[in-house]
UniProtKB/Swiss-Prot annotation:
Domain of life: Bacteria
Protein name (record): UDP-N-acetylglucosamine--N-acetylmuramyl-(pentapeptide) pyrophosphoryl-undecaprenol N-acetylglucosamine transferase
Reactions catalysed, as given in the entry: di-trans,octa-cis-undecaprenyl diphospho-N-acetyl-alpha-D-muramoyl-L-alanyl-D-glutamyl-meso-2,6-diaminopimeloyl-D-alanyl-D-alanine + UDP-N-acetyl-alpha-D-glucosamine = di-trans,octa-cis-undecaprenyl diphospho-[N-acetyl-alpha-D-glucosaminyl-(1->4)]-N-acetyl-alpha-D-muramoyl-L-alanyl-D-glutamyl-meso-2,6-diaminopimeloyl-D-alanyl-D-alanine + UDP + H(+)
A cellular component term, taken from the record's GO annotations: plasma membrane
Source organism of the structure: Protochlamydia amoebophila (strain UWE25)
Length: 376
C-alpha cells in the first residue's frame, strides 16, 4: 500500500539537506510513496531543490522575541500557519509528518498534533534548537545524531545516522575519479579545508599562515573558501609557495571533495560531522565560537571523544604551529588508519538505525493503531 509522508523543514542547509536526503531515501525504499514538503520560506530557500520536490508554503515567523511587535506578528503567523497546515494535511492525508527543526516547521507540526497524525522529529545538533525542544514531547519519536542530546529532550529519543543527499555515500564514488575532478594526484595525501557558511574567514587566514609549510611536502589541498575574493587571493598565495591546491569559492559536489580527502580541517557543524563519518575521513575541528548555545563545541567533542575520529582545537588556540603539529599527527599512516577504523566501527554499529527506518516503522505502527514504546 502506498504511503504518504509530509516533511517540514526550513531555514539553513543544516535543516534542508537532511530533509531532502530523507525524502530521497523514502522514495527509493517505498517506490510508490508520495512526498510533500510543507514549511515557510521554501519558495525562496537557496538550499531547497524545488525542481525535484513538491511543496506548499505556510505562514511562519520567529516566536521567541522580546520585541512585542515581533512577538505579536509571530503569534498571528503561527495561528495562520496552523490553519493553512490543517487544510493541507486534510487534503494530502499523510501517514507521518517529519520535522527537522526551525520556526518554519512549527505550524505544520502543531497541525499534525491537532489532527492526530504521528510526528517524527530529527535533531541534527548536540544542543537542540528551540522549536524541536518545545515540540519533542508531542512526537512519537525523535531521531538524534548525538547521544548527549537525549538528556536535553523529553521525547522518545533514538540515535540515528544523519540522512545524506543522494550520492553522499562512500561506496558510490571512486576515489581516483574524485581526485581527477579536482586535478589532484593519487600519489599525495589530500587535505580538505572549508569553513562552511559561518566563520570561513578565520580558517582561510589560518591556511595563509600555513602556506609556506606545505612546500616540498606530499600534501595537496582542496580549499573551499566561501567567497570569490578569498579564492582568488588564496590561489595566488598557494602558487607563490608552490603548493599543489584546488581552490574554489564554492563547491556543489562536496561528496567528491570528501571522497578525495585523507584528512580535513573545518568547523564542527552537524552536517560536516555526518559527512566526515560517512566518508570515514579523520579531521581537525575548529568549532565556530559564536554558534548558538556553543553547540559546535559539543558536536566536536562527540567526534573526538566518542567516535575517536579527530582532534578539536578551539579557535583562540588555532595557531599555525599547533594546527601543523595536529595535521602531522593525523596523516601518520598508523594513526590515520586507526582513526578511520574507529569512524567505520561507530558508523556501522548494529544498534544504530536510520531516520528512514524510524519513519517507515512509525507509519507501520500508525496503520496498526499502535503508539511506539519508549526505549529505556
Amino acid at each position: 500500500m502506498s504511503k504518504r509522508f509530509m516533511i517540514t523543514a526550513g531555514g539553513t542547509g543544516g535543516h534542508i539537506f537532511p530533509a531532502q536526503g530523507l525524502a530521497q531515501e523514502l522514495i527509493k525504499k517505498t517506490y510508490s510513496s508520495s512526498i510533500l514538503f510543507v514549511a515557510g520560506g521554501l519558495s525562496t530557500n537557496k538550499y531547497f531543490d524545488r525542481s525535484i520536490f513538491p511543496f506548499q508554503e505556510v505562514s511562519a515567523s520567529p516566536l521567541f522575541s522580546k520585541n512585542p511587535f515581533k512577538l505579536l506578528k509571530g503569534v498571528f503567523n503561527l495561528l495562520r500557519g496552523v490553519w493553512q497546515s490543517i487544510r493541507i494535511i486534510r487534503k494530502f492525508k499523510p501517514d507521518v509528518v517529519v520535522g527537522f527543526g526551525s520556526y518554519y516547521t512549527v505550524p505544520p507540526l502543531l497541525a499534525a498534533k491537532i489532527l492526530r497524525i504521528p510526528i517524527v522529529l530529527h535533531e541534527a545538533n548536540s544542543i537542540p534548537g528551540k522549536a524541536n525542544k518545545w515540540l519533542a514531547s508531542m512526537a512519537w519519536r525523535v531521531g538524534i545524531h548525538f547521544p548527549f542530546t537525549a538528556t536535553l529532550l523529553k521525547g522518545n529519543t533514538i540515535e540515528v545516522g544523519m540522512p545524506l543527499r543522494e550520492g553522499y555515500q562512500l561506496d558510490q564514488i571512486d576515489k581516483i575519479e574524485a581526485l581527477s575532478y579536482f586535478g589532484l594526484s593519487k600519489n599525495n595525501s589530500t587535505l580538505l579545508v572549508f569553513g562552511g557558511s559561518q566563520g570561513a574567514l578565520a580558517i582561510n587566514r589560518l591556511m595563509r599562515n600555513l602556506a609556506n609549510t606545505w612546500k616540498n611536502t606530499p600534501i595537496q589541498i582542496i580549499h573551499i573558501t566561501g567567497s570569490i575574493q578569498e579564492a582568488d587571493e588564496l590561489k595566488i598565495f598557494y602558487a607563490n609557495y608552490q603548493v599543489k591546491a584546488s581552490v574554489k569559492a564554492f563547491e556543489k559536489n562536496m561528496h567528491l571533495a570528501w571522497r578525495a580527502a585523507e584528512v580535513f580541517i573545518s568547523r564542527s557543524g552537524a552536517s560536516t560531522i555526518a559527512e566526515a563519518m560517512e566518508f570515514e575521513v579523520p579531521g581537525i575541528l575548529i568549532p565556530y565560537p559564536h554558534a548558538t548555545d556553543h553547540h559546535q563545541d559539543k558536536n566536536a567533542d562527540f567526534f573526538v571523544d566518542i567516535v575517536k575520529g579527530g582532534i578539536k582545537i578551539v579557535e583562540e588556540k588555532a595557531k599555525p604551529e599547533i594546527v601543523l603539529k595536529s595535521i602531522q599527527l593525523l596523516i601518520d599512516p598508523i594513526a590515520l588508519d586507526k582513526r578511520k577504523s574507529a569512524i567505520h566501527s561507530y558508523k556501522c554499529r548494529p544498534d544504530r538505525t536510520t531516520l528512514c527506518e524510524l519513519v517507515l516503522d512509525t507509519s507501520e505502527l500508525k496503520s496498526l493503531h499502535k503508539a511506539p514504546q519508549k526505549r529505556k
